[in-house]
């Protein structure tokens, strides 16, 4: 089964490479052999006061979607990040089958494979972001991808639910006997207000049965024309992960973002986020600390799928954890160009 899936993925990738020699209208997905092909290129320049400045090819991604029937579809996201090895797990950001069971209520969608974690406000890909960087809660309080099975059901026009059983946080193959389980309830509370409540819990280590549990609440508010407001609250525990004494490691995080489109071309963004690593278990610095970030960005649409943004980000800690543990703050400036098709 694994070999068959690999052949399908590689076959699709070969099809994409062949399609690269065919003219494709800008900012439009290609349709080749019944498959919808889209993707993006992400390049940047960044300068941090505690490290070198650099130009970077950050990501190249090609997404392949195909309906095999009215009840079965597949999707594969082939994604290369230059800093990762050319191994299967790194190349395939997502790869899954979706089965539509229309005879169950309003319709149950069952997804099997590797998929982006349905939790939190921010999304993974840069073309879906208003800033160059992700917030602290995205980087430290949430999984990125999950591998397993997920069911999604639309209860009504106002409520949808999803539940899943997976191999753990960002594990394509499980490293223990237990499965991580989770779910999300999405609510369209009123026009222009969408709220999601997510819970995920399970074992993520090979040598222990200690569980990591996270409650995450996110909201997207678009009640005012041209203004998008994002809010997220995250609370997590990991059993026996307290670095200061016996007990569980705990953390809380918060995000508030606002983006305003000045017109069809220009936009401005501000984001404030915090991460309180109460027992030193999540930020990776082996100390109890609280980090706070302020991010300001300007966006510009260049048309035909092209976009440009400039970002300044100030990251502060109540401990000296930057520049070789000698400073408690760091500033980063970045310019990013993306092209999606």
Region spans (language model):
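C-terminal closing repeat unit and adjoining cap/tail of repeat-based domains
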Residues: 295-313, 317-319
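Cleavable N-terminal export/targeting peptides
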Residues: 1-32
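Flexible, surface-exposed loop regions and adjacent strand-edge segments
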Residues: 56, 127-133, 179-181, 249, ...
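Outer-membrane beta-barrel "beta-signal"
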Residues: 185, 300-302, 327-341
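Outer-membrane beta-barrel domain signature
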Residues: 48-52, 83-88, 136-142, 170-176, ...
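Detector for outer-membrane/organellar transmembrane beta-barrel domains
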Residues: 158-159, 178, 183-292
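Outer membrane beta-barrel
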Residues: 30-170, 177-182, 186-195, 257-262, ...
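Mature soluble domains of exported/periplasmic/lumenal proteins and thiol-rich metal-chelating peptides
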Residues: 63, 321-323, 339
């Amino acid at each position: 089964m694994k070999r068959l899936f690999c052949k399908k993925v590689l076959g699709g990738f070969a099809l994409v490479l062949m399609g690269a020699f065919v003219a494709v209208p800008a900012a439009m997905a290609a349709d080749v052999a019944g498959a919808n092909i889209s993707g993006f290129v992400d390049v940047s320049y960044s300068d941090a006061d505690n490290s070198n400045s650099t130009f970077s090819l950050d990501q190249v991604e090609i997404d392949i979607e195909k309906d095999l029937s009215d009840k079965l579809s597949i999707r594969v996201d082939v994604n290369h990040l230059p800093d990762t090895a050319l191994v299967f797990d790194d190349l395939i950001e997502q790869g899954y089958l979706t089965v539509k069971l229309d005879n169950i209520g309003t319709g149950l969608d069952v997804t099997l494979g590797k998929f982006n974690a349905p939790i939190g406000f921010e999304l993974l890909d840069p073309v879906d972001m208003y800033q160059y960087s992700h917030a602290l809660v995205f980087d430290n309080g949430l999984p990125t991808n999950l591998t397993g099975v997920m069911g999604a059901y639309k209860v009504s026009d106002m409520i949808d639910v999803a539940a899943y059983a997976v191999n753990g946080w960002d594990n394509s193959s499980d490293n223990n006997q237990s499965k991580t389980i989770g779910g999300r309830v999405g609510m369209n509370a009123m026009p222009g207000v969408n709220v999601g409540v997510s819970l995920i819990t399970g074992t993520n280590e090979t040598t222990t049965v200690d569980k990591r549990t996270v409650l995450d609440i996110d909201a997207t508010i678009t009640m005012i024309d041209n203004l998008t407001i994002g809010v997220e609250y995250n609370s997590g525990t990991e059993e026996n992960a307290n670095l200061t004494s016996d007990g569980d490691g705990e953390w809380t995080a918060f995000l508030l973002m606002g983006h305003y489109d000045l017109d069809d071309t220009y936009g401005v963004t501000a984001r404030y986020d915090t991460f309180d690593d109460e027992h030193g278990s999540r930020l990776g610095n082996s100390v109890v600390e609280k980090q706070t970030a302020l991010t300001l960005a300007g966006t510009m649409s260049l048309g035909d799928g092209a976009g440009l943004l400039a970002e300044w980000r100030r990251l502060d800690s109540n401990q000296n954890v930057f520049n070789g543990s000698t400073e408690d703050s760091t500033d980063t400036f970045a310019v990013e160009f993306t092209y999606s098709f």
